[in-house]
Amino acid sequence: MPDFETLILERKEGLARLTINRPKSANTLNRKLMQEFNEVLDFLETDRDTRVVLLTGAGERHFCGGADLREATPETAKNMPAFGRDALTHFEDFPKPVIAVVNGAAMGGGCELAIACDFRFMAEEAKIGVPEILFGALPAGGGTQRLPRIVGLAKAKELIFTGRHLGAQEALAIGLVTAICPQKDLMARAETFAREQLIPRARYALSTAKLLVTRALDMDLASGLAFERRTIMTMASPAEMAEAREAAMKSNPAYQNIFSKK
């Protein structure tokens, strides 16, 4: 298993817990961290033991505080948005489910990182938002594109144009996060969801579903239906179909009567 400077990777029982380990810098995004995001996701993609990834921040105050402004030189300012977008898009394109465990503030690039994940479990004490416009900037890590897809066009405009942040209750109400709970229970809640609702599902079915749903809004309905048909026909091998049947019967004994029929 590779070593990392900015991340802590722990693997157990199908879960890979990935912790941004820059608490003295509010777990902000620098080039080294984004490079290691790509490296760890490449490693976990081929790790058969990893079924679900949980991403969180070290400490209790910050999930991720956005871009590390100490690296904001004229030269890095030209390349950082594209470099950051590539790293965040890696989470979106990663073929296994990723849960953002938002244990603290997720501001700017931290919010953009969270919305690049598949699910967001948020501490009741945390805040989330894209305040870049308050500083004459924009959420250039994919926020202008992903946020409308999650909360709708009107709400995304409000949040991006005003730069205001949200508490957990409002984030839940608008569909920005999946669930909220006290910080002390947050990781356990996310792990329980992963173990009970994701790990029992067939690998190929989850990865294919993620691909199809993620790309659904990128095409018109007719193109999407054709893409769905082609993808499902080409990605399910006989072995994977057998795994799907086994997973279904384990998660719900009622399926045994269906799949056992000759």
Could you tell me what each predicted segment is?
Residues 35, 49, 57-90, 106, ...:
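Glycine- (often His-adjacent) and acidic-residue-rich active-site loop
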Residues 40, 83-95, 101:
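Catalytic-core regions built around general acid/base machinery
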